Amino acid sequence: MKFLCLPGAYGSIDKFKVQLAPLVQELESDQSVSFHFIQGPYEVAPPIGYEDFFGGPPYYRFIVPSDVSEDTTDVIERIRDFPQLETPEMTMRELMTYGVAKTDDSARRTLDYLYDLMNKEGPFDGILGYSEGATIAGTLLLHEQMREELEGRPPMFKCALFFGGWPPMTPTLDGLVLSDESDLTINVPTTHIIGSLDPYLHGNLALYNVCDPDTAFIFDHAKGHTLPRDKGMVKELGDTVRQMIEEVKGTHSP
């Protein structure tokens, strides 16, 4: 299976290859999976005070704000003071309600960028996203489902891996998809790699809650907003991914 890999905000191809190297080595050891790494189409500067956290330049994003002003801010700035409400959906609404700049224009261009890349570098069997990359991956999956309904185009992706994810945008890019206010569901098998110590855990769970509960699986590496690197944990995760792949192959076999 060939996976398209999307890094988090301020990531790059080279950085994401390093972050994901243990899992890549595990899954490529028996040729279960091959990986195609990309980066966001927008080159950006990291937030002030976070330069060391994201490593050296260059920095890329998939989503950028279009109207930052005195009254609005990038959602990345908002999550520095991440709220914790009763449910993941309540938390995400609180996060996005006040003064967050719009990102629909950049997200629309990013979808065009991804579809062009899929045509040139694909086909791909699965998609893998970390943090902001998971948001865009989920958005792309829902957009593929909408195109199938409206235009009869079959989706390319058959499964997804989400690391430290956030809920997707609607296919029309006018807001987030939250399970307590939308019937939209990501209908391919998904594996959600979360850390129970992640300060943004509610973002992870809000994404999980808009996936098909019959084919969505949570894998907890028990750390923070990071990718698992411990050898035993990576081996266990590799086996989980292989199980998802076998289920997908069984579903799509002749």
Over which residues does each language-model region extend?
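Serine-hydrolase catalytic machinery in alpha/beta-hydrolase-like enzymes
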Residues: 1-123
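Short alpha-helix in the alpha/beta-hydrolase fold that links the catalytic acid
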Residues: 18-21, 174-177, 200-209
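A conserved short beta-strand
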Residues: 126, 149-166
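Gly/Ala-rich beta-loop-alpha elbow adjacent to hydrolase catalytic centers
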Residues: 128-137
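Acidic catalytic loop of the alpha/beta-hydrolase fold
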Residues: 168-170, 195-202, 224-226
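Short beta-strand/loop motif that positions the catalytic acidic residue
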Residues: 185-186, 191-194
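Catalytic histidine neighborhood in serine/cysteine hydrolases
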Residues: 211-228
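Post-His helix in hydrolase/transferase enzymes
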Residues: 229-243
